[in-house]
Amino acid sequence: MYPDQQKLKLIREAVEEQLTARSLGTRSPEGLFAPIDYTLRLGGKRIRPLLACAAATAFTEAWQRALPVAVALEIFHNFTLLHDDLMDRSPLRRGQETVYRRWGDNTAILSGDAMSIEAYASLAEVADKSLLAELLPRFSQMALEVCVGQQYDMEFETRSKVHVEEYMEMIRLKTSVLLGSSLELGALVGGATVEQARALYTVGIQLGLAFQIQDDLLDVYGDEKTFGKPIGGDIVNAKKTLLLLYTLEQLQGEDLKRLQEILTYTPEERRAYIDEVRALYDKAGTRLYAEAEIERLTAEAYRGVEQLPLREEGRELLLSLFHTLSGRTK
């Protein structure tokens, strides 16, 4: 195992220990806290806490200072997933039954609310209380922007026309700001200047945009075995992804009419037209456009890290995480 991978493993284990130490599974009432414990035990890559601790490592050897922030970010992220599943009526999360399916809508709402509060409780455990005045408004702004992004996402479902620029702004809010804030808050705890931390925030935004575009691509062009779920789900559900919106803007004539016709079908009917829609994406140059955007955004993120005066260990950790995110197949 490479040194950076060993360090990331160490950080991940420390995050898991801190999550366990919060004793969410043993608190009362069980009906409120058991769903929270269940959600956090579903796993995941723990990307956000890893980013926060790696960013701290870029400025100090004492990366453990960032653990309260890292845990806060992970709890908040999982809170958004819990509520997203409820709003989307998703039956499964990471292969397991979602909270609202197992405990009901009301419990999902209340447990999610409690998770968001628990995130703030973890943030408040930062050792340097004077630093908390810097962290709290940034964390709150991030939390609000994630909610704004989710609202836009829901509104897009009922709108007949959504522009690519609007979609990019939505995913910036819904996905990217949490990654950007993970880097920014971790850097601040590590001793970065406000300007250095903000530069890393921008890097996180670029990384988050590339991450979501890659997610859209994998759903249409990924390998089902490595992706972990059926390919073409976004097409079946007529989800307004970058791929669909760009294709609608690029196609003309009969091709455009045909795609618009398929979008009027029911989800079950659209299942038979996944290959045809994929062919229309190819005709519009959508895959090439999306791949070029991922490459551009990822290159900007790497360049942003290379230009900052960081401790070499932290830089290597960040670049290793970026490589994992940008090169993923699932």
PLM features: residue spans?
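Alpha-solenoid HEAT/Armadillo repeat architecture
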Residues: 41, 249, 264-267, 306, ...
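Mobile late-domain/C-terminal helix-loop "cap" segments
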Residues: 257-305
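Hydrophobic, well-ordered secondary-structure elements that form the walls
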Residues: 244, 301, 318
